[in-house]
Amino acid sequence: VILDVVYNHTAEGNHMGPTIAFRGIDNGAYYRLVEGDEAQYMDYTGTGNSLNVRHPHSLQLIMDSLRYWVTEMRVDGFRFDLAATLARELDDVDKLATFFDLVQQDPIVSQVKLIAEPWDIGHDGYQVGNFPPIWSEWNGKYRDTVRDFWRGEPATLGEFASRLTGSSDLYADNDRRPTASINFITAHDGFTLRDLVSYNDKHNEANGEDNRDGESFNRSWNCGEEGPTDNDEIRKLRRRQVRNFLTTLLLSQGTPMLSHGDEFGRTQDGNNNVYCQDNELSWMDWSMLEEEKSAAMLGFTKRVLSIRNHHPVFRRKRFLAGGPLGSD
């Protein structure tokens, strides 16, 4: 069990928001405030506030929480939302941040799986490949490269090969292994895999923000028509593209992360920001498995997973190393 934890902000929002968590206890200790205008919050998270990880109280809160989940609830590890925010000592992301030291020195937390979402929206917030050796990372470069390759984007072949073989350019220099790369194509944010091959544009009208919310550049390709279609050739092409993505993901070096429902074709009708939708749009519809095409896609996914599990060549412990061929 990997627990998704969000220690980078609270529900207060910006300075105009309600007092829900720590604002009424010690605003300056728990939140990053704008220097010289302490009524305002620094916002590295896109939520209106950022937790003050420079203060001992905030750090103690985080570490106590992590230890509790390991010792009492027996989780196997954590995925840290917007983890770059937790490493901001002054303004920049600091590889020597106190948070990293505390995690690495902790006899309990350091022994479980630690997975970073290695970015935030602040200055220089994209930190893929820069986390300490005991961490694994969501590999955003893998996602972007694989999406570009399968939509026919030129000049991606070389980088595609790097991502397929574990992204040694990102992780080998500090003695990390291929498993440090959490390979993914889709996640809870963004398109589902089926929507990735069915829509060129987001369709978030149901969110009530006039389709302004959510990522606009999705590196998607609808295979010829936007959204649902009765064209059998386009539907076949879309299913083939899904199989291309699944095979690439599950046979790449590194740790594959498959978003739930992608294995049988779950759709969000082109909505790539369903955090606010507690309805059929975001729910899992298990009855889809009664459909022939969905059951076939699940069967395909199982077969590819079986190939990965039965052949260690797809689960190397070390990066590939090139060398000259023998003359004989």
Residue ranges and their predicted role:
Residues 1-74, 79-105, 125, 170:
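Substrate-binding/active-site clefts of carbohydrate-active enzymes
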Residues 21-35, 135-149, 279-284:
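Acidic, His- and aromatic-enriched active-site or binding-groove loops in soluble protein domains
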Residues 52-55, 86-90, 172-173, 228-240, ...:
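Active-site rim elements
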Residues 58-69, 99, 238-249, 253, ...:
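Alpha-helical packing segments of well-folded alpha/beta enzyme cores
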Residues 74, 95-260, 264-265, 273-277, ...:
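Conserved alpha/beta catalytic core and glycan-binding cleft of carbohydrate-active enzymes
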Residues 268-302:
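Extended hydrophobic/aromatic segments used for targeting, binding, or gating
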Residues 292-327:
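Catalytic cores of secreted or luminal carbohydrate-active enzymes
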